[in-house]
Amino acid sequence: MGRKIVVALGGNAILSKDASAAAQQQALMDTAKHLVKFIENGDQLIISHGNGPQVGNLLLQQSAGSTEENPAMPLDTAVAMTQGSIGYWMQNAMNQVLKEKGLNKTVATVVTQVEVSADDPAFTNPTKPIGPFMSKDEADLAKKENPDFTFVEDAGRGYRRVVPSPKPIGVVETDAVNTLVDAGIVPISVGGGGIPVVADGNQLLGREAVIDKDFASEKLAELVGADALIILTAVPNIYVNFNKPNQKKLEHVSVNDLETYISEKQFAPGSMLPKVQAAIDFVKATGNEAVVTALDNIEGFVNEGSGTVITKKVRQQA
């Protein structure tokens, strides 16, 4: 039996410039054609995904249509709603591609709650970007209409709303995910970072936050005993001195070296930094490898090991 692998999809795997349902379903069909490479390779696949654009758009719709009789849903419920919609699109796309390939596998979405601490400092310091990019004028108008919202500039690409992003400390449905994997089913889990909940006695109480999907994927990978965590993004490798004349591609890199690069502020917060931090956390917790690469490099990774591979120590080159 192949390796158990958690693959975390980036937003570009779901959403193009067209935010319609049809366009997102088509994007996921293209994504599924790449992901099936793992199954063809004999790997046990667990899929996770982000929801930043989708949950932000949903909140805008909720806010615009909110009335006393039909109030807007809170953020934790909006996360659950996007888990359902994206999971529906993803499992249909995967099941179609699996049938076309003659592979006897099926895919199922797990509505997943992720436990966080009620005392997490993130609740008083919102940093997680969600929703569409806006111009400064658009962000100022949205702030005027929604005084409780916070907007910041995101990696030089425009302004976005930011919300609390607490760190995951547990995944409630871990056993359900493992049961599906053991039954030969491909689970989709911790969508959008999971629904943030805090434990209160026998209750799990939702919180208005969005957990970073890379940290949630790392926690899931750790808890299910994954052999590898693969974080997909828009570029095939992690780079230092990114977009500078002395840009350097990282292929095999140690945790210690990555931590040095973090101290040098090589990675943009809210962009590459959480992916690197999640990869480090997984390698430290398990001793197994983490990989950061692009969706369209999956075949290259499966066949040749290309991408950025993070291990405790740098491998000796042959």
From Swiss-Prot:
GO terms for biological process: arginine deiminase pathway. Gene3D superfamilies: Acetylglutamate kinase-like. It is found in: Cytoplasm. The keyword Cytoplasm applies. Signal peptide: none annotated. Its EC number is 2.7.2.2. Pathway: Metabolic intermediate metabolism; carbamoyl phosphate degradation; CO(2) and NH(3) from carbamoyl phosphate: step 1/1. Keywords: Arginine metabolism, ATP-binding, Cytoplasm, Kinase, Nucleotide-binding, Transferase. GO terms for molecular function: ATP binding; carbamate kinase activity. One of its GO terms (cellular component) is cytosol. It catalyses: hydrogencarbonate + NH4(+) + ATP = carbamoyl phosphate + ADP + H2O + H(+). PANTHER family: CARBAMATE KINASE, CARBAMATE KINASE-RELATED. Belongs to the carbamate kinase family. This is Carbamate kinase. The lineage of its organism: Bacteria, Bacillati, Bacillota, Bacilli, Lactobacillales.
